[in-house]
Amino acid sequence: MATKTTVQKAIDTTSTVTPLGTLLKPLNSEYGKVSIGWGTTGVMAIFMSLFAVFLTIILEIYNGSLILTDVTLQ
């Protein structure tokens, strides 16, 4: 039976504890919890504004490279 084999394989596999998993476990334990008040909204707003500045700088560099000087069209 395919189902019995699959279930048996799932039972036989054992999980291993890794240092990275141990390090990241506290982050996973906060899953589903809601922060009081605004939470990390302020941090998110700061990073969004920094990203907008970054995109603006990239756009300015790109637009500056498109300007062709001393080119005449006939």
Curated annotation (Swiss-Prot):
GO cellular component: chloroplast thylakoid membrane; photosystem II
Locations listed in the record: Plastid, Chloroplast thylakoid membrane
Bilayer topology annotation: Single-pass membrane protein
Primary location class: plastid
Pfam families tied to this protein: PsbH (PF00737)
Molecular function per GO: phosphate ion binding
Superkingdom of origin: Eukaryota
UniProt subunit comment: PSII is composed of 1 copy each of membrane proteins PsbA, PsbB, PsbC, PsbD, PsbE, PsbF, PsbH, PsbI, PsbJ, PsbK, PsbL, PsbM, PsbT, PsbY, PsbZ, Psb30/Ycf12, at least 3 peripheral proteins of the oxygen-evolving complex and a large number of cofactors. It forms dimeric complexes.
UniProt family annotation: Belongs to the PsbH family.
Protein function: One of the components of the core complex of photosystem II (PSII), required for its stability and/or assembly. PSII is a light-driven water:plastoquinone oxidoreductase that uses light energy to abstract electrons from H(2)O, generating O(2) and a proton gradient subsequently used for ATP formation. It consists of a core antenna complex that captures photons, and an electron transfer chain that converts photonic excitation into a charge separation.
Protein name: Photosystem II reaction center protein H
Lineage: Eukaryota, Sar, Rhizaria, Cercozoa, Chlorarachniophyceae
